[in-house]
Amino acid sequence: MLTVHHMRVSQSERIVWLCEELEIKYDLKLHNRDPMFSPQAIKDLYEIGSAPVIQDGDLTMGESAACVEYIIHKHGDGRLALPPSHPNYADYVYWFAFSNGTLQPAVSRLMSIKAAGVDSSNDTAKRYQGKLDLYLRHVDGGLGRTSKWLAGEEFTAADIMTVFTLTTMRTFYSIDLSAYSNILTYLKRVVQRPGYQSYREKGDPELPLMIDGPAPENFLEKLKSKA
């Protein structure tokens, strides 16, 4: 049976959510941060030491996008991916790649800059903040064109890949989404999905919903206080 290792309050939420959307059988293993980063149990499974990690027979795999692709095609009969024949195929592959190729790294860079003690008025910090603002406008504009989901009328894995950065990741770096009305409407639609609700119940029941404009409370500061 497929086993999914989820570190609470992390991007591995994508994999739990995906499995719930696909309604497939899987074994969920939950891990807590120790206190801020991956626990030894994750490092013992996967030498990179990051979540998610999935196991399927002799296979052990990390990387969100790889895990999503593997599960969709090995266990989900291709559901939540669009085939090349679909008219919105290009949108699907674009937003799927944009999520971890551009959007999430932009937030990660700003997290690193802040952790290094660089003031937000620093030219480099301002330049990277400007990049993130541009990317958020890009997502907001894309949602304005498609009106429902990133790849059009169908919910896809591109949405699953993107939502983490627009929600949970905001607890590690403050992002105010008040100016992005299409994103906010989109997030309200996301949390109505039974699959998303089921993921939260099983994987992160204590995590607040982060679908409003103002930046949520900083979870990283809570973790630091416990370190």
Tell what function each PLM region has.
Residues 27-29, 178, 198-199:
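A local structural micro-motif
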Residues 96-194:
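GST-like fold's C-terminal all-alpha helical module
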